[in-house]
């Protein structure tokens, strides 16, 4: 299998983003988004997916962090799609249930070429919590929406339990990381593209 790496720079009037990935890495990361809690989540995503990840981003965070957070997720989705190439030899599906103390999240990934997100189970009011001083709970869904759309993957994310807003978000990122790790891993028994259609 050839090197599964990708790099993309994306600039708008609202943000400037650079993302690099190596799907066959060891979970090394270099993250700077100017949003500390988001840095923490992306570092966890890299560590638990074993995808090497470099992110350098800046934006109009004096207005709101939303633009920078979403634009990083868009760019990350695009580099994941590019790094996957034709998806030959991958497992395609991945699933993980991950706890963080009282929080529990379940993620299922299908590298299907058809973007779709089902996101459920967050407790009422989670979207209004301000985490780490900048990151509102509502951004969690926005991040997963942007990644799934631009990576062209299907993701079912379900929060099964949780009380602490930080833990609820982090459990989701870690569950996504482990499910993604399984889905993008190469499987020596897979001959070609894992689809009866012959295309993903």
Swiss-Prot record:
Locate the coiled-coil region(s) and give their ranges: none
EC number(s)? 4.2.1.19
Reactions accelerated catalytically: D-erythro-1-(imidazol-4-yl)glycerol 3-phosphate = 3-(imidazol-4-yl)-2-oxopropyl phosphate + H2O
Location relative to the cell: Cytoplasm
- Fetch the CDD domains from UniProt: IGPD (cd07914)
Biological-process GO terms, alphabetical: L-histidine biosynthetic process
Q: Which InterPro entries match?
A: IGPD_sf, ImidazoleglycerolP_deHydtase, ImidazoleglycerP_deHydtase_CS, Ribosomal_Su5_D2-typ_SF
Molecular function GO terms recorded: imidazoleglycerol-phosphate dehydratase activity
- GO cellular component terms listed in the entry, alphabetical order: cytoplasm
Q: Which PANTHER family match?
A: IMIDAZOLEGLYCEROL-PHOSPHATE DEHYDRATASE, IMIDAZOLEGLYCEROL-PHOSPHATE DEHYDRATASE HIS7
Full protein name: Imidazoleglycerol-phosphate dehydratase
The organism's taxonomy opens as: Bacteria, Bacillati, Actinomycetota, Actinomycetes, Micrococcales
| Gene name for this UniProt entry | hisB
């Amino acid at each position: 299998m050839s090197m599964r790496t990708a790099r993309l720079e994306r600039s708008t009037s609202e943000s400037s983003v650079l993302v690099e990935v190596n799907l066959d890495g060891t979970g090394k990361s270099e993250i700077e988004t100017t949003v500390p809690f988001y840095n923490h989540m992306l570092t966890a995503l890299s560590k638990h997916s074993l995808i090497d990840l470099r992110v350098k981003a800046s934006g109009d965070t004096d207005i709101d962090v939303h633009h920078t957070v979403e634009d990083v997720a868009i760019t990350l989705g695009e580099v994941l799609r590019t790094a996957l190439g034709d998806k030959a030899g991958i497992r395609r599906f991945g699933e993980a249930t991950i706890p963080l103390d009282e929080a529990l999240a379940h993620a299922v990934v299908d590298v299907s070429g058809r973007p779709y997100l089902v996101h459920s189970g967050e407790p009422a009011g989670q979207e209004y919590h301000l985490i780490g001083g900048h990151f509102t709970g509502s951004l969690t869904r926005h991040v997963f929406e942007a990644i799934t759309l631009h990576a062209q993957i299907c993701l079912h994310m379900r929060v099964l339990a949780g009380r602490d807003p930080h833990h609820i978000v982090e459990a989701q990122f870690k569950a996504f990381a482990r499910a993604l790790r399984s889905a993008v891993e190469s499987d020596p028994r897979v001959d070609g593209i894992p689809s009866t259609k012959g295309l993903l």
